A protein has these predicted regions:
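Single-stranded RNA-binding regions, centering on S1/OB-family and related RNA-binding modules
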Residues: 1-119, 123-237
Length: 237
């Protein structure tokens, strides 16, 4: 009676968890003596009973995804980064430095310290190991300024809109540079603090009303109203 995942391993809907005389618990179902997951979460085995602890707001990494993460730990050969996933991601020093990494000579803290925000790309992930990151591409690396907004990762496609209509409107109307992390973290860089805050308000509105029609027009109207009624403060003051 085999099981196909280790306890506390991440599973997704439709994954075959076990086969044989097991009992289907929370977020699982049984069909033809096989137990499958119905939710994204962590699988648990309690003797003959199998259940999945759902992870509602967590992000499931995919190779190629752009993410915004926070450095959680510094190791001997790199950093552990919180990307809003069930497990921390790994950023190796060799994926940052343009020379061979030498622990005795290279001070990792001088590059990225705990608490630093990073824009990175996922280069490896297969659910049997922690996600691997890189920052060795244009536009990636340490975040030095801007406003970060966190939303439910599954709402990112709504922020983008059909053929990029929503995100392009936001950038145009708020005059902000907006970096969308597929993990639900969004970096906003504007000319003024007010512009960044207006962009953040718009993103929150999209997240809250993502199921409604006519949203692009309503968000556009809100942004224009807010932009027309505030005094702008330079970010350098």
């Amino acid at each position: 009676m085999p099981t196909f995942y280790e306890s506390r391993q991440l599973v997704t809907p439709g994954d075959l968890l076990a086969e044989g005389k097991y009992i289907a618990g929370d977020n699982t179902y049984k069909e033809n003596d096989k137990i499958y997951a119905t939710r994204v979460g962590l699988v648990n085995y309690e003797r003959r009973k199998i259940h999945v602890t759902a992870l509602k707001a967590f992000y499931v990494p995919r190779v190629g995804d752009l993410v915004v993460g926070k450095v959680a730990e510094i190791g001997t050969g790199g950093w552990m980064v919180d990307i809003n996933a069930p497990h921390l991601a790994v950023l190796r020093a060799s994926d940052v430095l343009d020379r061979p990494f030498r622990p005795q000579k290279n001070d990792l803290v001088s590059l990225f310290d705990a608490g630093d925000l990073l824009i990175a790309k996922i280069v490896a992930y297969d659910r049997t190991r922690d996600p691997m990151l890189t920052v060795r591409e244009p536009g990636l690396g340490k975040v030095t300024h801007g406003l970060v907004v966190e939303i439910t990762p599954t709402k990112i496609p709504r922020i983008i809109g059909r053929k990029g209509s929503m995100i392009n409107m936001l950038k145009r109307e708020t005059e902000c540079r907006i970096t969308l992390g597929q993990n639900g973290l969004i970096l906003i860089n504007g000319k003024t603090l007010e512009d960044e805050q207006i962009a953040a308000m718009a993103i929150r509105k999209i997240e809250k009303e993502s199921h409604t029609s006519g949203l692009t027009d309503r968000v556009t109207e809100m942004v224009r109203k807010e932009k027309g009624g505030v005094e702008h403060t330079s970010k350098e003051e």
